[in-house]
Amino acid sequence: MEVASLYRRVLPSPPAVEFASAEGKRLFAEALQGGTMEGFFNLISYFQTQSEPAFCGLASLSVVLNALAIDPGRPWKGPWRWFDESMLDCCEPLHKVKAEGITFGKVVCLAHCAGARVQSFRADQTTIHDFRAHLTRCASSQDCHLISSYHRSPFKQTGTGHFSPIGGYHAEKDMALILDVARFKYPPHWVPLTLLWDAMNTTDEATGLLRGFMLVSRRSSAPSLLYTVSCGHGSWKSMAKYCVEDVPNLLKDESLDNVTTLLSRLVESLPANAGDLIKCVIEVRRKEEGESSLSKEEKERLFLKEKVLQQIRDTDLFRVVHELQYPKGLCGSCSSSSDEDSLAEIAATVCCQGAAFLSGNLVSRDGFCCRETCIKCIEANGDGLKTVISGTVVSKGNEQAVDLLLPTSSSKTSLCNSNLKSKIVKYPSSTDVLTVLLLVLQPNTWLGIKDENVKAEFQSLVSTDNLPDLLKQEILHLRRQLHYLAGCKGQEACQEPPSP
């Protein structure tokens, strides 16, 4: 039986004014003359329609990130780096967003994970006068864009909660231009700012919190290279609680009389799925027939990731953590069988995810089976050999070959043309992740250590003051991500964390 279909909706007017109408054009011309349409041109250049009915938040953010010319640092399709909804999955699995939509706080988290600077305000954390001032500032600049989270009912539109970028502002008429990403439903339209405020001042039933708006702009520093904070797994909540609440409480124990004991207690108390919070960013590309080298940009990205990885392993904290995890004196070039199994599992999982995304399946890797994986070395355009994991993924009888560009630290062991488990690979390991996690926690976390000597020694180990610049930027970015993750799930405004 054929399901009834719809072809667009008639825009209720009033209260809205269609952008392409005679009145809409007049409002545009007057606002342009008034200087409050400066952000419009970049937004309209990268404006897109949401690809799924519940992808309004992802589409709005994708438009804004591309308008700000923020480089995602990884390919979208072919050689092209470009923000697409499929790449905005660090804070919520795409299949869940497709089924349920996405909350205000998760969109804020996504924007930050993507490398943007974000200020967010729920309606009860600001005023309509402040909102008007923020919108005027953004509309008068090409460097900042505003995304609104609102309910459609005040505009007499069908539907419920929605996200869209605001493309401009008419100061005299006090009207805002909504660039509705659901273009299959409503065209861009002008609405009274007071009505938009009412639409944001509504409760999202999924969270019990009010909707609001966020200001998105470029950062002066680059986003993280090797790791990212992820809340795509349900276990992130227990890990966030561990970082923010459990660790400070644990440090009150007066029996923690040396750094080794302190670290042991921290490791023993880690939640079972601690590794789900901080994830390594692994680049996946479709393997083209006859392709046997890395491009200049792929080589540069891999080089920077390897540099960060090596800088992590050069820290005193890594040495202490490694000695704690391998008390029998395993050398730095050694790896346990569990590490090898972990690499094999990671390779198979990422190969399937990558193949699913590259084939256009944005929400699930079900039906994708990784038949085999192997390690090889390929030429990096005359700059030596780089380690790549190749995998063959099977889906519905069709095979797809993919490559994982794997950052590794220096090793004397040859990896070329080896089976995945036949050689030892110094890939990002659990020791690296634990080291990063300890560095990422806010400095005031450790103030509760009772023994002053232990406190001083431990604070020296986790201090970012003497870290190399590349690693320091990585840690500070992850620290901001964790701050957003902990703060945006509750009543607090998702503002910038305190300076280190």
From Swiss-Prot:
<dbReference type="InterPro" id="IPR007719">
    <property type="entry name" value="PCS_N"/>
</dbReference>
<keyword id="KW-0479">Metal-binding</keyword>
<dbReference type="GO" id="GO:0016756">
    <property type="term" value="F:glutathione gamma-glutamylcysteinyltransferase activity"/>
</dbReference>
<dbReference type="GO" id="GO:0046872">
    <property type="term" value="F:metal ion binding"/>
</dbReference>
<dbReference type="Pfam" id="PF09328">
    <property type="entry name" value="Phytochelatin_C"/>
</dbReference>
<dbReference type="InterPro" id="IPR040409">
    <property type="entry name" value="PCS-like"/>
</dbReference>
<feature type="active site">
    <location>
        <position position="162"/>
    </location>
</feature>
<feature type="active site">
    <location>
        <position position="56"/>
    </location>
</feature>
<dbReference type="InterPro" id="IPR038156">
    <property type="entry name" value="PCS_N_sf"/>
</dbReference>
<dbReference type="GO" id="GO:0046938">
    <property type="term" value="P:phytochelatin biosynthetic process"/>
</dbReference>
<dbReference type="GO" id="GO:0010273">
    <property type="term" value="P:detoxification of copper ion"/>
</dbReference>
<keyword id="KW-0104">Cadmium</keyword>
<feature type="domain" description="Peptidase C83">
    <location>
        <begin position="1"/>
        <end position="221"/>
    </location>
</feature>
<comment type="similarity">
    <text>Belongs to the phytochelatin synthase family.</text>
</comment>
<dbReference type="Pfam" id="PF05023">
    <property type="entry name" value="Phytochelatin"/>
</dbReference>
<dbReference type="InterPro" id="IPR038765">
    <property type="entry name" value="Papain-like_cys_pep_sf"/>
</dbReference>
<comment type="function">
    <text>Involved in the synthesis of phytochelatins (PC) and homophytochelatins (hPC), the heavy-metal-binding peptides of plants.</text>
</comment>
<feature type="active site">
    <location>
        <position position="180"/>
    </location>
</feature>
<keyword id="KW-0012">Acyltransferase</keyword>
<keyword id="KW-0808">Transferase</keyword>
<dbReference type="GO" id="GO:0098849">
    <property type="term" value="P:cellular detoxification of cadmium ion"/>
</dbReference>
<protein>
    <recommendedName>
        <fullName>Glutathione gamma-glutamylcysteinyltransferase 1</fullName>
        <ecNumber>2.3.2.15</ecNumber>
    </recommendedName>
</protein>
<dbReference type="InterPro" id="IPR015407">
    <property type="entry name" value="Phytochelatin_synthase_C"/>
</dbReference>
